[in-house]
Amino acid sequence: MAHFAELDENNIVLRVVVVGNDINTSAGPLGENDMHVDGETWCSKFFKTETNTWKQTSYDNNFRKQYAGIGYTYDAAKNKFISPKPHDSWALDANDDWQAPITYPTVTEEGGVKYMISWNENNLRWTATDNSDPVNNFNWDATALTWNNI
């Protein structure tokens, strides 16, 4: 099966559909010709969306960086799908992956207990909880590379 993403006028993914590998292209079946323009044209005609663009996406991430999802952006210059920005403070790195302004914590567990780590956009820092009773809350100290109990 082949997967195609429908893009709006800003190259934002609206939906992803699955079509058969047996669709004909000028080079043979679609299943043997990834990213063939004839697959895009077929989707446009079949789904009656001549004003929108279609791009094939790889379920196994074999091409176009990653599998497209609703809200992803297709970067035509780089020929890849980029996930939505998770937080305003994050920026794309050289691989087009979103990175927080503070590196992800290097300590993810203590004494065999894993921290539940999340990004706090309001304070621009990593926070965590453990699964003790009562739950402990922590802030990541990016300089000392330790968790501080708060």
Can you say where each PLM-predicted feature lies in the sequence?
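Viral virion structural and adsorption modules
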Residues: M1-I150
